[in-house]
Amino acid sequence: MRLLLSALAFCAAVLGRAAEQDYPLAEAQEVRARGGLPNFFLKAQTTGAEVKIGYLGGSITAQNGWRVQTLAHFKKAYPQASFAEINAAIGGTGSDLGVFRVKQDVLSQGPDLLFVEFAVNDGGADPQRIIRAMEGIVRQTWQANPKCDICFVYTLTEALSPPMLEGKLQRSASAMEKVADFYGIPSITLGMEVAKLAKAGKLAWRAKLPKTDAEKAALGDKLVFAADGVHPHDSTGQVLYTQAIVRSLPALAIANNSPTVHVSNLALDPANLERAKLVPVTAAKLSAGLAPADMAADAFAKGWSKRLPAMVKLTQPGQSIEFKFKGTHCAVYDVVGPAGGMVAVTLDGKAQKPVQRIDAYCTYARLSTFLVGTDLPEGEHTVRLELLADPIDKAAVLAKNKNQIDKPERFAPLHFFPGALLIVGELVP
């Protein structure tokens, strides 16, 4: 699966550390059972039942770690039922994108249980925006299926660890706890044992897994968490995460053993993103000669068909898409990469800063988003996106991350590949 760059999340986490003291941090606790997972456990114990588990998160969830390991645990613990995963993990993405894609990527497949993992990638985000996005995920989920149980899980990085070492949750997880408290959603802090080992000097945050006797001896009794301090090794750090979930399951099972219909009439924040929608870009007006890509036959578009509902390939300067929406927020879900060009953005007749669709990490193509406007006045807005002919010094762009142009022909084009519009509100025909 193609991933958004998870390094962006790491940078956001570092930026967010300075603001920890400005936000009240929740006490760190491995499990808060709250309303439990009653419907999930009842179905898991039913002979012949088909149980679907959704995993919505970032690159830590995308790894073959806690997601794969917990699914294996459920299969072993409840052999009378069958289990299938809905893998909705995209590296480098937070709840701000998750709230727009949860319907398409998870809810459309009818999950019985939804794990939500965004604490790391939301590390530098504003707490109130986290609350609005997480609440939007909850409300959309229960609107689609009131019997779907939800569990928040909080992962950790070296950069986000200082509060945990002092017995507090990081800022992003503390914000998420407000949503969990309000809706009675259980939460599991996956990094409690990680923090315990780190505080005792028995954790190597960033190192390769030892292979030789000399490497093992050099580590002593330290457990190697990750190669980069962020993405746990599947056989070490991810196992600690899985063990935290397994330890927490009994508490979640006894919290509530009655079938439950989840309701969400009252809102924690009236400005939550329950109205967030992922709209195929083909719903927009395309300029003359511009046509949607065939998501089944077009080699490039097909590679993104699991995440993007459509694609329009703007390859000539002057090609454009236009649309109107009624609401308060608009962004674009697209593919950036070596072939990325410059895009002119016009909102309500006013030119915005042009958006460059290649960055320092674009030695390969990946999913991305860019903002058109947010916190807009409730009402109708008009958007125009046009591909520009403006040249880009791509060598200089790549050099910012010590990358280089390998094959000039890969970087020569100046293209734009939008797939969806992210709207809080409604598209206006």
PLM features per residue range, with description:
Residues E158-E193, L197:
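Substrate-gating cap/lid alpha-helix
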Residues G54, W66-V68, D96-I131:
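Oxyanion-hole/transition-state-stabilizing segment in secreted/luminal serine hydrolases
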Residues Q143-C151:
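A short helix->loop->beta-strand "cap" motif at the edges of active sites that frequently abuts
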Residues G91, A119-R129, L160-G167, H231, ...:
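The substrate-binding groove and active-site-proximal loops of carbohydrate-active enzymes
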Residues R129-G136, L169-A173:
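Charged helix-capping and loop-helix junction motifs
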Residues S59-A62, I90-S95, V120-A125, C148, ...:
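Solvent-exposed loop/turn segments at secondary-structure junctions
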